Amino acid sequence: IWNAFSYPAELPSINHPAKKDKPLFSYGSFNNFAKISDDTIEVWSRIVKNSNSQIYLKNSQKEASLELTENLIKKFKDRGVQENKVIFLETEKNIHDHLSLYNKIDLSLDTFPYPGVTTSFESVLMGVPVLTMKGHNLNSRCGESININLEMENFIAKNKDDYFDKAISFQNNLDIKKNFGNNLRNKALSSPLFDTENFTKDFTEIL
């Protein structure tokens, strides 16, 4: 692991609505909009069009410009996605409310070739698994590294078709989804991903 993530002393409760209370499966990405490449939009559009789902987007931890948001809406519409299936969330002012937004999401979709870092740590902390793309260098392997440390290699896609297949498969598999929520949070907190003390100690010794 190249990094360890510190988190608030008091975490929001994990409260993912039951399927019967949600008409649509919810994908989501809170990554910086600048990371949402055309290839990423292409695959996300295929996923939403071919499933009973919607996708929540939020520009990291600050509001995106109107121009950037409208550009994203146009790119999804150009690929046949209904505008009401792409939901933009406003930035919350405090970390507790920000993290609570992950309760809206069933599966986080990572961007590529540049994946999320903070957002991926936040997602697993809130019990939401992250589907990421296998990378080819340090900058593109952050999501891959996080999932490997969680023994979640099945959430690392080899290519765009594999990414699509895994996203649809997760939506349709209730048995897999039952393994997450608080179980994923506990697993993450006991992993090297959030062990800042030992990470700092090891890094200092190397210096």
Report residues per predicted region.
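C-terminal amphipathic helix plus adjacent low-complexity
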Residues: 31-33, 49, 53, 57-63, ...
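An anion/phosphate-binding loop that grips the pyrophosphate of nucleotide cofactors and donors
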Residues: 105
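Residues at alpha-helix caps and immediate loop-helix transition turns in enzyme cores, especially N-
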Residues: 39-40, 68, 101, 143, ...
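Short acidic active-site motifs
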Residues: 94-98, 119
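Catalytic binding pocket for nucleotide-activated donors in carbohydrate/polymer assembly enzymes
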Residues: 102, 111-196
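Conserved catalytic-core segment of nucleotide-activated headgroup transferases in glycan assembly
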Residues: 2-94
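Structured core elements
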Residues: 27-29, 56-57, 88, 108-110, ...
